[in-house]
């Protein structure tokens, strides 16, 4: 039997309390449901350091719980090591992408492929908007986008 190669993905947004923890939790559930979680290293992080150590926004936790998904994530900032250890760094908007590309240019031997998670959306919604100043419906929109994008991403790289 061929040995499975472990792949890794880091989901990134501005503060790591709304969008990226939702994407991380959605992707964890997808790979768990498909019995391939042992083949993946999955995490999420922030381009900023504002929320380091904080739990996800209660509205994000509630949205995930409504879909039967739990998370124990604590916010962290993206590190230089992430660019060397992760295969994929998937972010939510153009600002995240700019910040990550800038940081990656300072890293020797960057191996991560840095992309917008929305680039995998079959509905072609490239940007996953920050729901922080929005309402529960905005968090649900983020969740639905993450489900579509994570499914398509997994299908492509599996």
From Swiss-Prot:
It holds the Pfam family LMWPc. It is found in: Cytoplasm. Belongs to the low molecular weight phosphotyrosine protein phosphatase family. The modification Phosphotyrosine is found at residues 132-133. It is an enzyme of class 3 (hydrolase). One of its GO terms (molecular function) is acid phosphatase activity. Acts on tyrosine phosphorylated proteins, low-MW aryl phosphates and natural and synthetic acyl phosphates. One of its GO terms (cellular component) is cytoplasm. Gene3D superfamilies: 3.40.50.2300. Keywords: Acetylation, Cytoplasm, Hydrolase, Phosphoprotein, Protein phosphatase. Changing residue 146 to S: No effect on activity. It comes from Bos taurus. Interacts with EPHA2; dephosphorylates EPHA2. Interacts with EPHB1. Interacts with the SH3 domain of SPTAN1. SMART domains: LMWPc (SM00226). Changing residue 18 to S: Greatly decreases activity. Its EC number is 3.1.3.48, 3.1.3.2. The modification N-acetylalanine is found at residue 2. PANTHER family: LOW MOLECULAR WEIGHT PHOSPHOTYROSINE PROTEIN PHOSPHATASE (PTHR11717:SF35), LOW MOLECULAR WEIGHT PROTEIN TYROSINE PHOSPHATASE (PTHR11717). It catalyses: O-phospho-L-tyrosyl-[protein] + H2O = L-tyrosyl-[protein] + phosphate; a phosphate monoester + H2O = an alcohol + phosphate. Phosphorylated by LCK. Phosphorylation at Tyr-132 increases its phosphatase activity. The active site is at 13 (nucleophile), 19, 130 (proton donor). Inhibited by sulfhydryl reagents. SUPFAM superfamilies: Phosphotyrosine protein phosphatases I. This is Low molecular weight phosphotyrosine protein phosphatase.
């Amino acid at each position: 039997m061929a040995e499975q190669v472990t792949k890794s993905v880091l989901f990134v947004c501005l503060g790591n309390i709304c969008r990226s923890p939702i994407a991380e939790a959605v992707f964890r559930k997808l790979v768990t449901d498909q019995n391939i979680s042992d083949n993946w290293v999955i995490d999420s992080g922030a381009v900023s350091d504002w929320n380091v150590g904080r739990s996800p926004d209660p509205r994000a936790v509630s949205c995930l719980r409504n879909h039967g998904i739990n998370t124990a994530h604590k916010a962290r900032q993206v590190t230089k090591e992430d660019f060397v250890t992760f295969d994929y760094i998937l972010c939510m908007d153009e600002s995240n992408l700019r910040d990550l590309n800038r940081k990656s240019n300072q890293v020797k031997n960057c191996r991560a492929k840095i992309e917008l998670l929305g680039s995998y959306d079959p509905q072609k919604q490239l940007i996953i908007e920050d729901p922080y100043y929005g309402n529960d419906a905005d968090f649900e929109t983020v969740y639905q986008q993450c489900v579509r994008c994570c499914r398509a991403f997994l299908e492509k790289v599996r």
